[in-house]
């Protein structure tokens, strides 16, 4: 008999940056991948051509979240993991509705993973002890807070707390952990002055790139014991 096809890994926000790097990492390992994307970047076509299932989704409403969950449920009988990478970033600033900022941040960072974890729970169960994973991507600001991005920090803190709650709910079949990055990689338009200021905020004074995240994700997926924990990726920034 042939070897059974691995269950897919679901990555939200898989069309660019860290989500895209994770998708290609798994594809190169012959691991089936399902990604969500909101905007059709050129990279999406490359993923489709490589065999990834790419589902356009709008997580700005609960109906959009559940419509995406329905598509996943129709496409697979099980999941190896869910990586909650989809994110948004809004600051409190003059002229911006504070209620809109808070609602947007809570919708993408709290409502979306909360609803998806419940809706897709049965796809994660039934595969054995510690055989499935959920990984929430939070942020360095969970511990420190942010005076300029209060709603963003609060929503990521809520997601961090949900990590422990879902770990209790889903053990021992499913491990649930979070990764809390600070600066991982720059945007192309970031100027030299900004880059240097950002690098100086950590002890390691470098932007490590996607591989640092990929290596930690691989560790969490491989572990048969670690659950309910948050893993900072901040280069010692908390010691500055």
Swiss-Prot record:
InterPro entries: NAD(P)-bd_dom_sf, Sc_DH/Rdtase_CS, SDR_fam. The keyword Cytoplasm does not apply. Disulfide bonds: none annotated. It comes from the Bacteria. It holds the Pfam family adh_short_C2. One of its GO terms (biological process) is one-carbon metabolic process. The active site is at residue 152. Its EC number is 1.5.1.50, 1.5.1.3. The keyword Oxidoreductase applies. It catalyses: (6S)-5,6,7,8-tetrahydrofolate + NADP(+) = 7,8-dihydrofolate + NADPH + H(+); 7,8-dihydromonapterin + NADPH + H(+) = 5,6,7,8-tetrahydromonapterin + NADP(+). PROSITE patterns: ADH_SHORT. CDD domains: PR_SDR_c. Catalyzes the reduction of dihydromonapterin to tetrahydromonapterin. Also has lower activity with dihydrofolate. Belongs to the short-chain dehydrogenases/reductases (SDR) family. FolM subfamily. This is Dihydromonapterin reductase.
């Amino acid at each position: 008999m042939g070897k059974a096809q691995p269950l897919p890994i679901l990555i939200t926000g898989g069309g660019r940056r860290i989500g895209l790097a994770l998708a290609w990492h798994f594809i190169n390992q012959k691991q089936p991948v399902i990604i969500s994307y909101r905007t059709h970047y050129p990279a999406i076509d490359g993923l489709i051509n490589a065999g990834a299932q790419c589902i356009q989704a709008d997580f700005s409403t609960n109906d959009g979240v559940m419509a995406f969950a329905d598509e996943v449920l129709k496409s697979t009988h099980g999941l190896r993991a869910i990586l909650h990478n989809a994110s948004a970033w809004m600051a409190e600033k003059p002229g911006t509705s504070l209620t809109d900022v808070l609602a947007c941040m809570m919708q993408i960072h709290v409502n979306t993973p909360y609803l998806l974890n419940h809706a897709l729970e049965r796809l994660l169960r039934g595969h054995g002890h510690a055989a499935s994973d959920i990984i929430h991507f939070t942020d360095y600001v969970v511990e420190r807070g942010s005076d300029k991005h209060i709603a963003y920090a609060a929503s990521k803190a809520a997601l961090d707390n949900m990590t422990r709650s879902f770990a209790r709910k889903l053990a021992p079949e499913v491990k649930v952990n979070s990764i809390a990055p600070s600066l991982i990689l720059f945007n192309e338009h970031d100027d030299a002055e900004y880059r240097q200021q950002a690098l100086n905020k950590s002890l390691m004074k470098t932007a490590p790139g996607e591989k640092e995240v990929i290596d930690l994700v691989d560790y969490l997926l491989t572990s048969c014991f670690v659950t309910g924990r948050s893993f900072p990726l901040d280069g010692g920034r908390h010691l500055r």
